[in-house]
A protein has these predicted regions:
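Glycine-rich phosphate/pyrophosphate-binding loop shared by adenosine-nucleotide-utilizing enzymes
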Residues: 8, 60-65, 96
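A short beta-loop-alpha structural element at the N-terminal edge
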Residues: 6-23, 34
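Conserved beta-strand-loop-alpha-helix junction that forms the acyl-donor binding cleft
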Residues: 105-108, 132-143, 160
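Conserved acetyl-CoA-binding loop-helix of GNAT-fold acetyltransferases
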Residues: 103, 109-122
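Conserved GNAT acetyl-CoA-binding A-motif
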Residues: 95-96, 124-137
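Active-site rim helix/loop that mediates acceptor-substrate recognition in acyltransferases
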Residues: 32-59, 67-73, 87
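Conserved active-site alpha-helix within GNAT-family acetyltransferase domains
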Residues: 114, 126, 137-155
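Conserved acyl-donor/pantetheine-binding loop and adjacent beta-alpha core of acyl/acetyltransferases
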Residues: 67-100
Length: 162
């Protein structure tokens, strides 16, 4: 599956892309990343494999990535997901989670993120899933981006205690 948005080409991520994806991840978040996802892309790949992951290319160079998963809601143990299922059980039997997204700094603001999210959302819809992203409340840039993409804040907030 390949999608083009102006000069941005989006395709499924492969194992051969990992080196370039890890370079983007380290460029954005350093070796000790924590923004929304607490571990490196390498670790994500080792746990989840390719999942529903995409890369964006401009002139043959990988300039961004999106990693996600699509899961059946009835298999989820989360009360949040059960609540969502009860409200929309027949319409959305699955959830497509955007787990990680990263765009090289020099290509941010050039529709790369939009192309990646659109590709993931299309795949989610084909699978009968609603698309969801969990982000840190303090990540104003990602929050604005998701709002521009048509995402709406949902009613729950997660609290955590060490």
């Amino acid at each position: 599956m390949v999608r083009n948005t102006s000069s941005v080409k989006v395709r499924r991520m492969t194992h051969d892309d990992l080196n370039e994806v890890n370079q983007i991840d380290r460029q954005l978040f350093g070796e000790n990343r924590v923004p929304t996802w607490p571990f490196s892309f390498d670790t994500y790949w080792n746990i989840y494999g390719p999942g529903v992951s995409f890369v964006a290319e401009i002139n043959g160079q990988i300039v961004g990535f999106l990693a996600g998963t699509i899961v059946s809601q009835e298999r989820s143990q989360s009360v949040i997901d059960m609540m969502h299922s009860a409200q929309r059980a027949s319409r959305y039997p699955k959830i497509g989670y955007i787990d990680m997204i990263g765009i090289s700094k020099q290509f941010q603001g050039k529709d790369v993120g939009r192309a990646l999210v659109n590709a993931f959302h299309e795949e989610s819809k084909r699978s009968g899933a609603i698309t969801r992203a969990h982000i840190k409340e303090s990540d104003e840039t990602l929050s604005r981006f998701l709002s521009k993409m048509g995402f709406k804040k949902w009613e729950t907030v997660t609290y955590e205690k060490d």
